[in-house]
């Protein structure tokens, strides 16, 4: 799940951008 920074998968999402 990628809800954005501070959420589920937020860390991975932030690294992806």
From Swiss-Prot:
<protein>
    <recommendedName>
        <fullName>Uncharacterized protein IMPP18</fullName>
    </recommendedName>
</protein>
